[in-house]
Structure formats: C-alpha cells, structure tokens
Amino acid sequence: TGTVIDEAGIPVIGANILGKGTTNGTITDMDGKFTLINVPENAILVVSYIGYLDREIPVAGKSTLEIRLKEDTQKLDEVVVVGYGVQKKVNMTGSISNVKADDLSVIPSTNLSNSLAGRAPGATITGNSGLMGAKSEIRMRGGFGDPLFVIDGVIRDKEAFDLLEPYEIDQMSFLKDAATASIYGSAAGNGVVLVTTKGGTKNQKPIFNYQGSYAFSKPTQELFADRWDAIDDLDYQNAVARFQGTPLPNGEEEYAYFRDNKINYNVNDYIWQNPWNTKHSLSVNGGTDKVKYYVMGSFLAEEGSYVSLENKKFSLRSNLSVDLTKYITMNVNLDANQSNDKRFYWPFSDDDDQSVYDLYRCTFNAMKTTPFYSYLDGTPANTITDYPIYQDYGSWQGWNPVDQVVGNRYLKTRRRNLNGIVSFNINLDFITKGLSTKVMASYLGHDYNRKRFMTFQKNYKFQQADPQGNRFLPAPLNLNEYNTFNFSQNYENLEYKTKQLWTEQFNWFVNYANTFGKHDVAAMVVFEQASNGGEEVSAKGESPLTNLDQMFNYSSDALRRWGEAKEKNGGRLSWIGRFNYTFDQKYIAEFSFRYDGNTLFPDGKRWGFFPSVSAAWRISQESFMEPTSDWLSNLKLRASWGKLGNNSIGNYEWQALYGSGYNYAFNSNKSNGLAMTTFSNYALEWEETAITNIGLDFGVLNNRLNGTIEVYDKKTDGILYRPTLPESLNQFTSPLQNLAGVNNKGLEITLGWNDRVGDISYSVSGNFTYNKNKVTKYKGELVREWRTDANGKKVWYQNVGTVANGSSNLIVEGHEMNEYYMMNPYKGNGSYFNS
C-alpha cells in the first residue's frame, strides 16, 4: 500500500502505479492512496501522472510507501507561438488556438488547410469543391477573407501555407482576438495563422525519419449517375410528353430494346475512377554543441475522380542554426517547392477556380439512351473512339460531356516558390541582463506558369436505322453530319501566362525580459520594412493549322495574335511594439501596437495605428483558492480589446486606371487612344475591426480535464466594396469604397481530456463555435411595401432593389450576411419571388 502526494503534500488523485516490466498496476483513490497485490520484494514501481515527472520507486521489501511527485516544469513553462515571438502559455492574455502538428500528420490530406477542419476553435474550414487539389477556405470568427499567414516570421499567402507538409511543422497558432493579432496591424483583420517549422537538436547524432502513405477513396454508395438507367430516361421522356400533351415518344419496342439487351450508356464508365494519392517524405535532424540542422524533402502525387486530373508536388526545406560566438547565433532557413497540376479545360470558370460544378451537373444529366462514342459503322462503343456522338442539352446543342473530360483540350499550371531567411540573434546580457537584439532578412520568389489549350468539339450525329420504329437502333455514321461545339469561343486557341513575383522583408528586433522579485517585465520593439513587385506576361494565338499545342502552329495574322504585359510594385513600413507585465504570477497585463504605412492607399491615408490592451487574472494562484488546489489545477480569467486593419486589396485601387482600344477617326484617319476605365478614389482608407474578447481557461484533476470558454464582439467598419454605377457609366469600373459595416458576435468552447494508463497516453478533445453576424451599414435599410404578383394577387414584397439585383441571398442592413429572402404568401397564394 502507499500514498502519492505532490510537493505541497496534497494527495494526487488518479496517479498510475505499475510494476516495472509487468502489467500489474492500479491507480490512486480520492485520498491519493493505492493498494497493489502480488508485488515481489525486489520490484520497482513506476509512478506517473500528467503534469508530473515520472518516478521509479524500489519496493525493497517495504509494505507501505509515501511517494512524492515533482511538477514537470517543462509543462509549466510551455510556450506558444505569438506574433514576433513566443510566450508562456500560462501568461497568455489573448485568444489563441493551437493545433498540434502530430494531429495533422495522421490525416491523409493532400493540402494543409483540408486537414484543419474541427481542430481550431473559431476557425471555420469549408471545402468549396471536390475537385482534386482544391483547397479549403479558412474563415476566422466571421471574417470575409483568408487570414494572414506568417511562416517562420515571413508573411506568405495561402498557397504557401497549403504547400506545407505536416511533418515539417513545429507549432501552429491561430490568433483570433485583437490582443494577439493587432501586432500585425493592417493585415490582420481576418485573423492570423502563425507557423514555425522544425529545427535540429544540439548534441544529437543524425536521426532519419521516413513517412510514406498511400490513400484512395471509393464511394460508399452508388453514384447518382449509376442509379438512373436508360429505362428511367424513357420514362422521363414519356412523362414530359404527357405534361405537354404530345404523343409518347417511347413504346414497348424501345423499352424492350434497352431492357432485353441490357443497354445503358453511363457517363461514369468513361470518365470516373477512384481517386488516390501517395505521399513520401524523408527528413534528417541533429546537431553538435554549436550547430543544429533539419533537412526534409517530400513528394506528393495524386489523381482525381475524373481520369484527366493530375497533381504533383515537390518540397525541400533546410533549417540551420549555428552559434558563431557565445553571444551570436545565425539561422539560415531555405524553403523551395513546386507544384504541377493538369486538368481538362473548362471555359466557364476561372482558370484557377477549382469549382466546375456546372460540368458535374451536365455529366449527371447525361442521357442513358444515346451512346457517347461509336464506330464508323454506327455500332456503339464502350471505349473512346474517333467518333464522339453529340447529345442535346437545351441551349447546349451538339455537346459531348465525356469528350470534354477525356479530349485533347487541357489546362496545365506550374507554381514554384523559393524563400530564404537569414537572421542573427545577438545576446546583449553583457550590457544588461535580459537584453537582446535580432536582425532578419528574407527574400521570397514566386513564379506561375499556365498553359491553356482549347479546341472545339467535333461531334457526330447519331444515325437512326429505323426512324419510324425504334429510333434508338443505330445506323452507319454520316461523316457529313456533325456539329462543332465552340464553347462560346470564336476560335480555337492556345494561351500562355507567366507571372514572376518577389517580396523582400527586413526586420530589426530589440527585446528585453527580466524579473525583479515578484515583478516580471518584457518589452519588444520591431522595425519592419518590405517591398514587393512582379511582372505578368500573357500571349494568345488563334486559328491553329493543326491540333498541335505549340504556338508556331497558330496563325501569324496580327488579328489572331494577342499579347499583354503588366507590372506592379509596392512597399510597406511598420513600427511594432509589445509590453508585458506580470505581478506575482497572478496578475498579467499587456499592451501592443503596430503603426503601419502602405502604398496600397493614397497619400494622407497610408498610415494606420492599431493598438490593443489585455489583462489576465490567474485566480487559481490566489491564497483563498488553496482549499480547491487538490482538484482545481488552473483557473484564469482574461479580457482584451483592440483594433485591426485589412489591406487585402490590389495595387493602384485608389488611382484612376486607363485602358486601350478607345479609338477615334480624325479626317478619316484612325487614331489610337486611351480612356479612363476605373474612377479614382483618394478617400480610400483602412478597413478597421475592433474586437472585445473575454475568456475563461480552466483545468481540473491536474489538468487532465481542461477547457476554455470565450465570448467576443467583433465590429468591422469601412468594409471595402465596389458600388453599382449608373447605366450611363457602364464603360467604367467603380472604384473600391469604404461602404459597409458588419458586427460579429460569438461563443467558443473547447474541452479536452488527457491521461495515461501505464505506458499508453491518450487524449480526447472537442470544440464548439457559434457566430452570428449583422450588417450594420450597407446602402440603407430594407423597405417593405405592398406589391402584386403575376396573377394580380397582393403579396408582402420585400423591396431590396436598391441594395441588390435580383439575387435571393442578399446583403441588407439589420440582417445577417447573405440571408435568403422570399415573399410571404398572401391568403394562401403560393407564389414567391426572389426579392
């Protein structure tokens, strides 16, 4: 028997007692006591508990033991990544969600954002497309756009974030309130995601780690296109005829033809496959007493559910740290990656848009009574041939959905990124204790190449052997009866697009941290300067001589050749500060600010000041809480307020823009000219968000059960939006203006349990997020008045003609974003209209 207590003599409830090398074990009761039978005199007991250091106790013939556990100070000193540094978790005053990299590495996802669903309270992860390679959308606390992504201290875009491998991540933090995010000022209006990558370990021999996986997906139920067969098509065609009062097109002869011959032309037989992906990574880390290194290379390949979808990704990372002297450490980080994508060309969505839902719709609706391909003699083919057969789709006459996926037209993209970071950490303790400085420089290069090959479809007409009888009996093809489907394009074409972008960033840090008795103080001041620019070139050729996908194959006529070039540049300058004060490890206060200047805005509007204040009270550390110390491990109340900005706009949005093609004839001679296409707006300024956050952190049973409850109020004003211009100005694009405001309020709850049984550790966690928004400013309030419907009946019409143009999900003051509006029926009249 025995008792397990902590350093203060308080019983430890639920501690694990296990005979070393055996399965003989037990746990302590509510008084910290335990009883273990069948224990040899020379046995060694292993005593463990979450938050305490393990102990091995020799029994040595004793029948009663008192075991004292020491707190694991490493747990107490756990730090989390914050803006421009790290902080002890127990001293945090703001709202941060941390995601463990180990939790992400077990998910067979091909990009990082898809792995985050449900793992970061306050962050909503939404998949917008099932297309291979499609990225999920990340929205934090009702934000309108992507959060700011910062990787190893350098601002990056979401593409770079998604290219990260879980294996190379050390820590990931979601900064959700102003206390944590305002230090990023004008770019933090939609929240901040911080990532630090892994480094090496001093005095460690090289450790190699290989991670490999193969994953595939298979439908758990029958696809919709497989459920509907040719008989269903015949029934549907007859039902339409009955509704229209016309003769039925299908009789027993047609039904017998498909039923008895088991004929069913299924689009999925041609284009569908079970998607798969394979991932491989190899890393090595280690170090000496002065050098630490971490190197990782990875490869990903995947194919989508359609046969012409391919994606490959290559990544390389090298993180090196060298102690040059006793006081100076140099860090060199290098990150390079490349992704190659290929898919069928779909002209009705943007080239980089992963949503091709209208193609899905067309494939689902493909008729089962007409073959997709045939041989020259008219025999329907179960494979791809040179004779695609067209199907009629309402206004899309003469189209073949299978040929769109498996045909020769395509879209290829290649993206490459190179990021180099060099920093020097200088310890200035020889001047005064706790003083240090750091300088950091980074260069980011990005290039994007896209090749788009577009050809028309040439589809042949299905020939009927018996037009007066069974109209589905095939006859030999007539090669003179075909349809050319041009996808609303005038000419077949080939287009190239290339972009080269760069960003340079320089930071200078001055840090100070010290303790004076019960007073802990810390301060940081940062100067940051960044510049960016890039060039974009596009070229297009039309009217090819053959089907070869090379530019020399296209017409040299100047009217059939097209080219465009753009360039951009900009810069930003910032002063950043953070000051922390803690008294007696109970009372914590923090003030931070960022003073931002950015060329995205006009003179006089370029600078913005974004402060935040926050405080926390560690209630569990108070003397009056001692009676609860045997079960209450942590109780902390915190509150924060601050302002954030949003600069997610393009270059030159405030300037008047001009375009070519506006010509005039002088004396019968054509003169080329330029004309204004976008109005200027010299009043354009920062979109600002003020956030108030109150949180309660708690832990019981030595933090085996822990959680957080938070409420927030997020008010955004000056939201950038393009107003609708009068018809008389239809040649112009309206400038961005600060027109709208939105208020988001919400609740977040996180609850987790972690424990250990013998050598097995386990944890369970869950989170709940609720967010409700209301439009506080947008073109005026909703107007209600009586109107009549198409039948002359009175309806209560919600008139929103001044705030939107016919959409059923609208933005209206006093209502939620994108609410759906319908007419209230009047006296049973079931008519409704999109307001």
Label the model's feature ranges.
Residues 209-259, 756-835:
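Conserved small-residue
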Residues 104, 145, 313-315, 319-328, ...:
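Extracellular/periplasmic, surface-exposed regions of secreted and cell-surface proteins
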Residues 13, 36, 55-56, 157, ...:
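A sequence-level detector of short linear motifs
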Residues 1-317, 329-331, 337, 393, ...:
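Short, small/polar-rich motifs associated with maturation and membrane association
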Residues 4, 19, 27, 148-151, ...:
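Hydrophobic beta-strand positions
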Residues 243-263, 278-279, 351-400:
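Acidic, glycine-rich flexible loop segments
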